[in-house]
Amino acid sequence: MKEFIIKANKAVTNGEINLKDLPGSSGRLDLLCRCVNSAFFLSHDMRRDTIFYSVNYGDPNPPVTLKFVGSELKRVSPDERSIALFIKKALEKDATELWKESTSGIYSSKREFRDIILEKKNEGKRIFYLHLNGKPLEDFEFKDDEDFLFVLGDHIGIGDEDEEFLEEIGAEKISLSPLELHADHCIILVHNILDRLK
């Protein structure tokens, strides 16, 4: 199982989303939509072995975590507007500590960024923090029977405190490129690496 989590520092936390202004008034929701596209959509299929989390810390009610489960997703199209509509529906529900399903395979809760990561660590997943200054990809060995969580930052990053937290729990800091990449591009590169193990 491949799982991805992004800390979305400015992404809105209610359903008041302007579909005509995803990058601006919605707190870079366009970035999240592209990440969902990259996490799940193939040319004529969907990735069923993937889960994607977005932990939104924007106004008015942070945090709200969205969870997308590839094996359960239905009716979502790959374009940003379609994905944004499904995100809007999820954010219209009052989030609590428990996961609430808004549409097939899409859930919301009030879980924190660190809580999700600790939960995955306790499940035995290898935790990778994707960072420009990490160890080169070539220095790591991946096995097909392992479960992974890949931690991503948005255009702002995850912040010093969360970086220290990842270091404390033993997350492996990995660099996919000598150049700074968009989060959605990182997801595609990770998929490509793991696809080749099969």
Curated annotation (Swiss-Prot):
<dbReference type="InterPro" id="IPR029026">
    <property type="entry name" value="tRNA_m1G_MTases_N"/>
</dbReference>
<dbReference type="GO" id="GO:0030488">
    <property type="term" value="P:tRNA methylation"/>
</dbReference>
<dbReference type="GO" id="GO:0008757">
    <property type="term" value="F:S-adenosylmethionine-dependent methyltransferase activity"/>
</dbReference>
<comment type="similarity">
    <text>Belongs to the methyltransferase superfamily. TrmY family.</text>
</comment>
<keyword id="KW-0963">Cytoplasm</keyword>
<feature type="binding site">
    <location>
        <begin position="176"/>
        <end position="181"/>
    </location>
    <ligand>
        <name>S-adenosyl-L-methionine</name>
    </ligand>
</feature>
<keyword id="KW-0819">tRNA processing</keyword>
<comment type="function">
    <text>Specifically catalyzes the N1-methylation of pseudouridine at position 54 (Psi54) in tRNAs.</text>
</comment>
<dbReference type="InterPro" id="IPR029028">
    <property type="entry name" value="Alpha/beta_knot_MTases"/>
</dbReference>
<dbReference type="GO" id="GO:0008175">
    <property type="term" value="F:tRNA methyltransferase activity"/>
</dbReference>
<protein>
    <recommendedName>
        <fullName>tRNA (pseudouridine(54)-N(1))-methyltransferase</fullName>
        <ecNumber>2.1.1.257</ecNumber>
    </recommendedName>
</protein>
<feature type="binding site">
    <location>
        <position position="153"/>
    </location>
    <ligand>
        <name>S-adenosyl-L-methionine</name>
    </ligand>
</feature>
<dbReference type="InterPro" id="IPR007158">
    <property type="entry name" value="TrmY"/>
</dbReference>
<keyword id="KW-0808">Transferase</keyword>
<keyword id="KW-0489">Methyltransferase</keyword>
<keyword id="KW-0949">S-adenosyl-L-methionine</keyword>
<feature type="binding site">
    <location>
        <position position="130"/>
    </location>
    <ligand>
        <name>S-adenosyl-L-methionine</name>
    </ligand>
</feature>
<dbReference type="GO" id="GO:0005737">
    <property type="term" value="C:cytoplasm"/>
</dbReference>
<dbReference type="Pfam" id="PF04013">
    <property type="entry name" value="Methyltrn_RNA_2"/>
</dbReference>
<feature type="binding site">
    <location>
        <position position="186"/>
    </location>
    <ligand>
        <name>S-adenosyl-L-methionine</name>
    </ligand>
</feature>
<comment type="subunit">
    <text>Homodimer.</text>
</comment>
